[in-house]
Structure formats: structure tokens, C-alpha cells
């Protein structure tokens, strides 16, 4: 979906008990030996911190700050195919927010997100609750199977589904054909968003499930063991106790999913060649920015679109965090 | 955990219906699991089946069942020898990218995460808070400027163009920092210092061993990130000899679709996809305990 | 993406690059070791190395042939990407001012775009004008602007109709010579077998060049453009010829007489081999494509001239075609020009590979009109000498200008065709909508547009 999803788990990590034990005994024996840090120690401390953070700082500056600054500078200039380029302040941004291509793309990903995100996170939550509760062999298979698509490059995933959606030899159409329902054009206008949503759901449900599962595993068992003794069923325990207790993890996955959805790019790009009259160059805002730069050589305007999208994402996620502040602070 | 063999006795009559309902519940849960397994497995199943077919069978037989005679080994043989064995080369490239970036990114993230958690230094808060904003930037926005900047130092179209940007893993830093805060008490480090250990020794001998699950997690996820990365190498590399698998397979597929005539290539793309995802799935399966450990340490039943 | 071409043939194995045995360390060292480019041989007396981007696999042998016959210049071939992927990389490298090859394979319709970004070297300064008479007239006009030569033509795509002789016999169809007959036969066929179609209307971006070729035949000349006359450009995408084509095909689509599968799909390929499509309206490179995609229908196909709008007419169109251009980033303009001119040029050895294995349609006069090409019999077409259809078609193609924003125009056209297919807009308004969008885009890009 986007790079950020590939970057790693978004789950907070609970501490290891064994570590705490070790730390406890180690520290206990030494408590008396504590001393106040001298000036030289503090300087050394500071130097050490700087030293350790330097590689990251350099990379951060080189591959994030510098490109961003450069892109921002680009976005303040206007260039045309004929006539060269000039500094134009925020003209590109003004154009962005009245550009029907950009706005229709934003609308499309919002509509897409409103349906796909609840379905995917709903499935992920359901899966997480199941594997938290059931320890059978089936549950283990279930856990790994759902997670497997995460290991598949998005390019290959979309390519596989491209074959599966085929009207001639795809299994979906064989099925509807056999049932006498006729062909279903999964890559046509009306179903394309659904088909894309299916790919994303397939790819990311397992990952989100594992994150939520990790949060569930971090809950103190006693709370709901007690509830069970009180006669609450598994379903009730799950809905009334477990779900509220991991609400911060849910909010977190929700936020990352929203960010990813707004940046929707890889799947439509991979399906684009096979359905180019449906997936137009402005299909999603990110695809639009990509095509502007790489197909039409409109680097400046493309940079402005990207920044505008970044701003939408930024504001969107902060609003979201603000709105769910209470909920996420529950824990 | 809630097995049937729960302590039974001392029950009243109202217990009976609940047992029934929970049995029904178990059936429902199992049915849900089986249905979801089938759905999530289906594309993999298709891939395995399709990889055993030749071109004719691929486009004329039922998609989800085998066709005899199969040509799995022919497909593999062709996959590994096509165009001078470029697939193997791409695989090697991918391993290099993922290996170096994975180890490098983990090291960088560990040092930085540890520093953020345990040291105070100028710029600490600014850097850390901008780290979270970093993930909001769409990758496409960075692609062009990064390309232009790298080309100024003549690094585009080299392996470094893929490796260097992949070393930056803000999430890894975040994860390590949280992990260090939660599982590495100051007292432990302080005690080692009192014992006369230098800062480096504290880091390598005291902190790192404790952080192992987090490191494995960061390593695995950054390797997967690089292994699966498509956009960055697509933009950075012009030379097919430097392509990773994702870009290489895409170029085969693109060629098959557009230059057409590419009968052979469809089977190659399919067999190539299967071979490309196997290492990752195996890695995830084998290392399951470690990476799940990274996520869930401390709360195992 | 912009055109459906480049047949790929039998698996040609690369022996030179024994990548299999390259150890990981070796690859790593080689790749990480140094900067990027070749050709900096400077003072040393070894041969000059010219880096060439091209994407069809048979090119390997052509390069080997060139390197065998040249001492001072050697070609290093790189497959940077297929079609649009290659153009994307070229544009990015040009923007960066670094990283472009010396010589690059470009389809004709991309030339003005790259030229406008100052990416193409004027080979006229290095003697390329001497080649003028070696190439078909209309092709030379596509690559030059007066004495400025921006590319050397390689192959073209004169259009014709390939058809399944066996199906035509089975359903008693007549080989259509006009588009009106084509429609009648299409109705007859579809009635006889509701699962079969006369052909497939290419609605995707891959087929944008196909649609443009058909309009070309119908007399449409949407652009009046020459780099030397900037910023003037004439844009008329809704002229009578263009409208005639969409009215006609829109009618066939609405009556379900043709299929509407995207060309860049496996389903389309399958349709060609399964008998779902009775004809394939394609270009001079099409036989290679068809014979490898629909291998099992070998011997059943024949080639006939493109149906005409008026009975007895001789209007032709072109779909696709490529050239070799030299980029402005080359450090060896002289040698690069030589490579562009001589890789194929009039070399019979190179063209033998091009014709027999890559199924290229030569635009080089001596080859095109030579008996080897003209009289060649094709088993796939039941021994027919198909070039006796294609060569006259090639000679009937008139002049045609492309725009320097062809990607935008093709994408816009594809989007609007998609809307019409979906019933969101009328077929009759497609051309007008495209015209509106493209002219306003051009105006915004600083062109002085005359409509």
C-alpha cells in the first residue's frame, strides 16, 4: 500500500519479565553504590548520545530532510513545456486545490477507505480475538495463513490477483459462469474499487491482526478470567472487556491504515496497464503525482501535489488523533 | 486456554444451555477460521498450481486445479536460465539489498533508539518528534528529489542508490526506543557503570543482549521491507543487471503484456513469483518465535 | 505502454553474461565499486564504448553483429525497461542531467516530447542527413525537422487485417474490403456464434496507438507541429477523420459486434488463439506477435489489406514504429551517431535477425524493397507472402505529426474512451472532450494553440 507499512510493526512492546528480574537483582545489589554524575560524566554522556544518534541523524538529513526541502523548493516554482520555469510562490498549491483531477482522486480514496478500512480492521480484530482465545492447531494455521500475504511483495500480490480477476480464466468468473450468473467484469469501472479493496484486504489483514493480537496478549489475564467466573461468555468478554482494553492499539492501526489509504498507490499502479481505461492517471492523488512527474515531466506541480497530499494526511491524522484522544488514552 | 477439560463439578442446571451454546460457538469459530484460511490461501494455491502449467494449460484449464502433464521443472529450468540466468542475478541482488539494508538499518535504529531512550543530548526532542512526522510523507514525493540529489553525487544507478535510503527506518528507531524504555531499567545501566564499565561496554554487553527480541524484529521487518520494495529501485536503477526481483519480474510481466509474443514469459513470471516469495514465507515461519517474541515478549501464557 | 509491439521470439539465450556463476561478492564489488557510466575511455586508445538502451531480446544478436564488424566503436546494451518504463527513466535522467545512455530506442510518437525537453542530439551536425534517401519518406519526416535529424528510423507498423481463414470458411464470411463490409461480416459471425467476435476494440492505453493508426487511415491529422516553429502548434483531435472512427467503432461496441477487452491482458492473447476473435487488425510487426501468442493456430491465419472507408481506396495507417536517437548527454556525439545509423541501417546481417527473429518491419528502403523481405513466405500464414500486403501498405502511408505531449493526449483519449464504453458519455462526444482537454493543457504549457 505504501512504504510506511513495510517499515515495521507499529505495536508498542511490553517489557520482558526475565529482563526485569535480572535488572532488579542486579540493581538491588548495587543501590548503595549510586553516585551523582560529575560534570565530566555528563559531558561524556551527552557525547555518547550524540555519537549513537549520528548515523541516524545523517541518514535522516540526507534522505528525508534534504529531499523534502528540495521538493518544497521545486513546488514553489512553475515550469511549462514551453517557456522555462520561474519562481511562483504558492501558485501550484492554489492550482492543486482547484484541480478536479486531484480532488476526484481524494474523493475516490476517501470513499475507498470508508468501506475497505472497516472491513479489513474488522476482520483483523475478529482474527486477533479468535487466536487470543483459541489455541488449537487450526488456530495456529489460521494465524500463519493470514499473515503470509504480508510477506508477498505488493507487486506480486497485485499481479496474482490480476490473473485471478481475469474474465476468461479467473476462478471468480468460472464460478459465476458455472452458477449461470454470467461474466463479472472485475476490472471494469463499477467493480474496480472493490477489486482493489480485496487485494489490500488480503495483503494487510494478517499484519494488522498480529499487531492487535500482540496488544491482546499484553493484557492482564486476571481481568477477564474474573469476568468469566462471573458468568460472562467468551463473546461478551471479547466485546465488553478485551476490545475496549486494546482500544489504543486499534486507534493506532486505524491511523496507519488511514495514512496508507490516502497514499494509495502500488496496487492501482500495478493493475493500471491491464485496465488503463479504468485506472486513469489521476485515479488516486499519489498516482496522479507520480504520473505528473514521471510521464508528463511536470516535476514542480507534482511536488506541490505531493506536499498537498502530505498536508491532507498530516492534518487528517492529527484530527483523528485528537478526536480519539480520550479513547486512546483509556489504557 | 479454555479447554473442555475445565474443572466441572458443582454445577447448577443453568449451566447446560451455556455448554451447548459454547459448543455451537466453537463450531462457528472454527467455520470462520476455515473460511478465512481458504480465502487467504487461495491466491497462494493458485500460484502453486499455475507454476506447474505450461502456457497452453495456463490459459485453457481450470485455474485452481492441476493439469497433467505438468511442466513445473521445465518452468523452473527456464526460469533460472532465461536470458543468461538473469533471474538468479536478480535474486542475488535482492539478497544483497535486503541483507545489507536489513543489518545496517537495524544497527542504525538500535543505536539511535537506545540513545533516544537513555541519553540526553541537544536536538533530541526535535529529532524524535520529526521522526513521527516522517512517515506521513508519501514515498512518491521523495522519489524525484532523492533521485536528483543522488545523481549529483553520481550514486544513481548503483547499488548504493537502493541501499542507502533503505537504511533509514524511523519505525525501527521508534520500536527500539519504546522497547528500551520498557525493558531496560536505568538501574541496570547505572550498576554496570558503577562497576567501571565504559558507555560502549554498557551498550554492547548489557543493553544489546537484553534487546535481542526487538533487534530480530527490526531486522526481519526491515529486510522484508527492502526485499519487497519496488518503487525505490524502479526509480533509481536503469541497469537490468542491478534490478532486484520485484523490478525484474515487473519488467518481464510488462514485456509479456506489451511487447507480447511473450508466451514463455507468463510462465516465467508465475514461477518467478513463487520462487521470490518462498524465502520470505520460510523466514517468517522459521523465525516466528523470535519476531512474535519481539512483539509480545513478556505476556506469553 | 503506448503501443503494443515488439514481438519476442524463441528463447534467445544470453551466453556472454554468465550471471549464474557470478558470486554475490563479485556482483557487489562490481556494482558498488564505482560511478555509473561507461564511455569515459577518454585518452586511452581502446574503442569508444557507446551505451544503448533498447528492450527487445533479439537485440543482443544485433549488437553482437555490430561489435563484430566495428573496431573503434563498441556497443554496450542495457535493457533499462520496456516501453513507457524506459521513457520514464530517460526523462528522469535528462532532468537530473546525468544517467542517460548515449543512444536510446524511442518510438516515433515519443520523439517530439523528448526533443522538446532538449534531450535529443541533432545528428544532422554529424552527417546523418546523408541517410535521408535510405529511408521511407514519411518515416524520415517523423525523425527530422528540416536539416535537423533527431533519430534514425528502424521499424514501422503499417496496418493490415489478419484473419482466421478457417473461421471465415466455416461461417461463410467474405474477406471485407471496406469498413461497411467489415460490419456486415461482424454481424453475421456474431449471429452464427454468439461467443465469437469479428475483432476486439482496443480500449486501453496500449491500444491508443492502434486507435490513432485507424484515424490516420481515416485522414485525421490531429497535430501540426515542428520543433523549429515553437511555440506554435495546431491541435485538431476532433476532425472529421477522428470522428468517423469513433462513430464507427462506438456503433460496433454498442451493438456488441466486437469485444472490448484491453489489449494488454492475457485474456486478449487468449482470444486470439482460442478462436474468439476472427480478425486481428494490426501492424507490420503483428505477425511475430501473433505467431508466438497463438502458436497453436499456425497455418490458419492470412493477411489482407486494411478495410477502406471508400471502396477501392488506398488509405493506410501506421501503428507503432521505433527509432534510435542520440541523447544530449553523450560524450561521444560522433560515435553515438554512427551507432544509431549503423546498428541496423542497411546492414543485411542485422536486418536478417530483425526480420526473421524480431519480426521488425524495416523502414530502410533497400531492405524493405529487397526481395528477401518482400518474397519471404510465412508458415504461420499458410505460406502466404504477407509482405506483399504490408509493403504496399507502408508505401501508402502519408505524413503525420506527433505532439510533444503525446503521453497526455493518449491518456486523455484512453480515459474518455473508457467513459464512453461505460455509457457515461456518448461516443460522438469523445473526440470533442479530448480536444478540449488537450488544447487547454497545451495552452497552459505555453504553446500557442491553433484549433
Regions found by a protein language model. Name each.
Chain C
Residues 65-135, 169-177, 269-271, 275-279, ...:
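Extracytoplasmic "Venus flytrap"/periplasmic binding protein-like
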Residues 1-50, 68, 128, 439-451:
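Short, low-complexity disordered leader/linker segments with a strong preference
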Residues 44-57, 73-79, 102-103, 150, ...:
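Short, well-ordered beta-strand elements
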Residues 112, 286-297, 310-411, 443-451:
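C-terminal lobe and pocket-closing loops
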Residues 108-159, 210-216, 302-304, 388, ...:
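Hinge/lid segment of periplasmic solute-binding proteins
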Residues 186, 231-261, 306:
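Glycine-centered hinge/linker elements that transmit conformational signals in sensory
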Residues 148-154, 159, 183-234, 277:
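Extracytoplasmic/periplasmic solute-binding protein
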Amino acid at each position: 500500500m505504501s512504504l510506511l507499512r513495510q517499515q515495521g510493526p507499529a505495536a508498542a512492546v511490553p517489557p520482558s519479565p526475565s529482563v526485569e528480574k535480572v535488572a532488579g537483582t542486579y540493581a538491588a545489589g548495587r543501590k548503595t553504590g549510586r553516585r551523582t554524575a560529575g560534570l565530566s560524566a555528563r559531558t561524556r554522556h551527552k557525547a555518547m548520545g550524540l555519537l549513537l544518534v549520528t548515523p541516524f541523524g545523517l541518514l535522516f538529513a540526507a534522505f528525508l530532510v534534504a529531499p523534502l526541502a528540495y521538493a518544497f523548493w521545486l513546488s514553489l516554482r512553475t515550469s511549462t513545456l514551453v517557456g522555462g520555469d520561474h519562481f511562483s510562490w504558492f501558485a501550484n498549491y492554489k492550482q492543486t486545490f482547484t484541480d478536479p483531477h486531484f480532488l476526484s482522486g481524494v474523493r475516490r480514496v476517501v470513499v475507498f477507505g470508508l468501506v475497505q478500512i472497516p472491513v479489513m480492521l474488522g476482520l483483523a480484530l475478529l482474527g486477533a480475538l479468535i487466536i487470543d482465545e483459541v489455541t488449537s492447531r487450526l488456530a495456529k494455521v489460521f494465524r500463519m495463513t493470514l499473515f503470509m500475504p504480508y510477506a508477498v511483495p505488493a507487486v506480486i500480490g497485485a499481479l496474482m490477483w490480476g490473473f485471478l480477476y481475469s474474465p476468461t480464466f479467473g476462478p471468480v468468473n468460472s464460478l459465476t459462469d458455472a452458477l449461470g450468473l454470467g461474466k463479472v467484469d472485475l476490472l471494469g469501472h463499477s467493480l474496480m474499487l472493490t477489486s482493489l479493496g480485496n487485494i489490500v484486504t488480503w495483503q494487510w489483514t494478517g499484519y494488522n491482526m498480529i499487531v492487535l493480537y500482540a496488544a491482546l496478549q499484553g493484557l492482564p489475564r486476571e481481568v477477564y478470567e474474573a469476568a468469566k467466573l462471573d458468568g460472562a461468555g467468551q463473546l461478551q468478554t471479547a466485546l465488553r472487556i478485551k476490545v475496549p482494553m486494546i482500544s489504543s492499539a486499534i486507534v493506532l492501526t486505524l491511523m496507519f491504515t488511514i495514512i496508507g489509504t490516502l497514499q494509495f498507490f502500488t496496487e492501482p499502479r500495478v493493475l493500471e496497464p491491464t485496465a488503463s481505461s479504468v485506472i486513469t492517471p489521476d485515479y488516486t492523488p499519489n498516482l496522479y503525482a507520480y504520473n505528473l512527474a514521471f510521464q508528463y515531466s511536470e516535476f514542480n506541480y507534482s511536488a506541490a501535489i505531493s506536499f498537498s497530499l502530505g498536508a491532507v494526511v498530516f492534518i487528517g491524522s492529527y484530527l483523528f488523533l485528537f478526536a480519539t484522544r480520550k479513547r486512546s488514552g483509556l489504557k | 486456554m479454555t479447554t473442555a477439560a475445565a474443572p466441572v463439578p458443582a454445577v447448577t442446571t443453568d449451566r447446560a444451555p451455556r455448554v451447548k451454546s459454547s459448543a455451537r460457538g466453537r463450531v462457528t469459530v472454527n467455520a470462520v477460521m476455515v473460511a478465512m484460511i481458504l480465502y487467504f490461501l487461495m491466491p497462494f494455491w493458485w500460484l502453486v498450481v499455475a507454476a506447474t502449467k505450461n502456457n497452453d494449460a495456463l490459459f485453457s484449464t481450470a485455474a485452481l486445479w492441476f493439469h497433467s502433464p505438468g511442466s513445473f521443472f521445465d518452468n523452473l529450468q527456464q526460469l533460472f536460465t532465461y536470458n543468461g540466468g538473469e533471474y538468479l542475478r536478480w535474486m542475488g541482488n535482492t539478497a544483497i539489498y535486503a541483507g545489507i539494508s536489513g543489518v545496517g538499518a537495524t544497527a542504525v535504529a538500535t543505536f539511535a533508539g537506545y540513545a533516544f531512550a537513555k541519553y540526553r543530548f541537544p536536538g533530541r526532542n526535535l529529532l524524535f518528534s520529526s521522526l513521527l512526522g516522517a512517515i506521513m510523507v508519501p514515498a512518491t514525493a521523495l522519489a524525484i528529489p532523492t533521485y536528483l540529489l543522488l545523481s549529483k553525487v553520481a550514486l544513481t544507478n548503483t547499488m548504493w542508490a537502493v541501499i542507502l535510503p533503505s537504511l533509514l527506518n524511523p519505525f525501527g528507531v521508534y520500536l527500539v526506543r519504546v522497547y528500551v524504555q520498557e525493558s531496560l531499567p536505568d538501574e541496570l545501566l547505572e550498576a554496570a557503570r558503577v562497576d567501571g564499565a565504559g558507555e560502549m561496554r554498557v551498550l554492547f554487553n548489557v543493553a544489546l543482549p537484553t534487546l535481542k527480541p526487538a533487534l530480530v524484529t527490526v531486522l526481519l521487518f526491515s529486510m522484508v521491507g527492502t526485499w519487497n520494495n519496488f518503487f525505490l529501485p524502479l526509480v533509481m536503477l536503469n541497469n537490468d543487471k542491478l534490478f532486484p526481483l520485484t523490478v525484474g519480474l515487473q519488467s518481464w510481466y510488462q514485456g509479456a503484456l506489451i511487447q507480447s509474443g511473450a508466451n514463455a514469459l507468463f510462465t516465467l513470471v508465475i514461477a518467478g513469483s513463487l520462487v521470490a516469495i518462498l524465502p520470505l514465507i520460510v523466514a517468517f515461519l522459521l523465525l516466528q518465535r523470535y519476531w512474535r517474541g519481539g512483539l509480545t515478549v513478556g505476556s506469553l501464557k | 505502454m503506448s503501443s503494443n509491439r515488439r514481438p519476442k521470439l524463441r528463447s534467445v539465450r544470453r551466453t556472454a553474461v554468465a550471471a549464474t556463476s557470478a558470486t554475490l561478492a563479485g556482483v557487489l564489488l562490481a556494482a558498488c565499486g564505482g560511478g555509473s557510466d561507461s564511455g569515459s575511455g577518454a585518452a586511452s586508445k581502446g574503442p569508444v564504448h557507446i551505451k544503448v538502451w533498447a528492450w527487445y531480446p533479439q537485440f543482443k544478436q544485433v549488437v553482437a553483429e555490430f561489435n563484430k564488424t566495428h573496431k573503434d566503436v563498441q556497443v554496450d546494451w542495457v535493457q533499462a525497461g520496456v516501453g513507457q518504463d524506459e521513457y520514464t527513466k530517460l526523462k528522469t535522467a535528462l532532468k537530473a542531467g546525468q544517467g542517460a545512455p548515449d543512444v536510446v530506442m524511442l518510438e516515433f510518437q515519443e520523439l517530439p516530447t523528448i526533443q522538446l525537453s532538449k534531450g535529443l542530439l541533432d545528428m544532422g551536425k554529424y552527417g546523418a542527413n546523408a541517410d535521408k534517401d535510405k529511408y521511407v519518406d514519411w518515416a524520415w519526416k517523423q525523425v527530422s525537422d528540416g536539416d535537423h535529424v533527431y533519430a534514425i528510423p528502424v521499424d514501422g507498423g503499417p496496418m493490415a487485417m489478419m484473419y482466421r481463414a478457417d473461421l471465415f470458411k466455416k461461417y461463410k464470411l467474405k474477406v471485407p474490403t471496406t469498413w461497411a463490409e467489415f460490419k456486415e461480416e461482424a454481424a453475421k459471425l456474431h449471429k452464427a456464434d454468439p461467443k465469437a467476435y469479428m475483432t476486439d476494440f482496443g480500449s486501453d492505453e496500449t491500444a491508443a496507438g492502434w486507435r490513432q493508426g485507424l484515424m490516420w487511415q481515416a485522414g485525421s491529422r490531429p497535430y501540426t507541429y515542428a520543433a523549429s516553429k515553437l511555440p506554435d502548434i495546431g491541435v485538431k483531435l476532433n476532425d472529421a477523420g477522428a470522428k468517423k472512427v469513433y462513430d464507427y467503432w462506438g456503433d460496433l461496441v454498442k451493438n456488441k459486434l466486437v469485444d472490448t477487452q484491453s489489449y494488454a491482458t492475457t485474456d486478449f492473447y487468449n482470444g486470439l488463439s482460442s478462436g474468439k476473435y476472427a480478425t486481428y487488425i494490426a501492424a507490420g510487426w503483428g505477425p511475430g506477435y501473433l505467431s508466438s501468442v497463438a502458436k497453436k493456430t499456425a497455418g490458419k491465419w492470412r493477411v489482407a489489406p486494411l478495410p477502406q472507408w471508400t471502396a477501392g481506396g488506398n488509405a493506410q495507417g501506421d501503428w507503432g514504429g521505433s527509432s534510435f536517437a542520440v541523447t544530449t548527454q553523450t560524450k561521444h556525439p560522433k560515435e553515438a551517431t554512427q551507432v544509431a545509423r549503423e546498428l541496423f541501417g542497411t546492414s543485411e546481417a542485422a536486418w536478417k535477425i530483425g526480420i526473421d527473429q524480431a519480426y521488425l518491419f524495416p523502414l530502410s528502403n533497400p531492405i524493405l524493397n529487397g526481395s528477401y523481405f518482400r518474397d519471404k513466405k510465412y508458415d504461420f500464414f499458410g505460406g502466404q507472402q504477407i509482405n506483399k500486403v504490408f509493403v504496399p501498405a507502408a508505401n501508402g502511408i502519408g505524413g503525420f505529426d506527433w505532439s510533444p505531449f503525446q503521453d497526455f493526449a493518449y491518456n486523455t483519449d484512453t480515459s474518455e474512451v473508457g467513459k464512453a464504453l461505460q455509457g457515461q458519455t456518448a461516443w460522438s462526444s469523445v473526440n470533442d472532450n479530448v480536444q478540449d482537454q488537450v488544447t487547454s493543457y497545451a495552452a497552459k504549457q505555453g504553446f500557442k494553440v491553433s484549433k
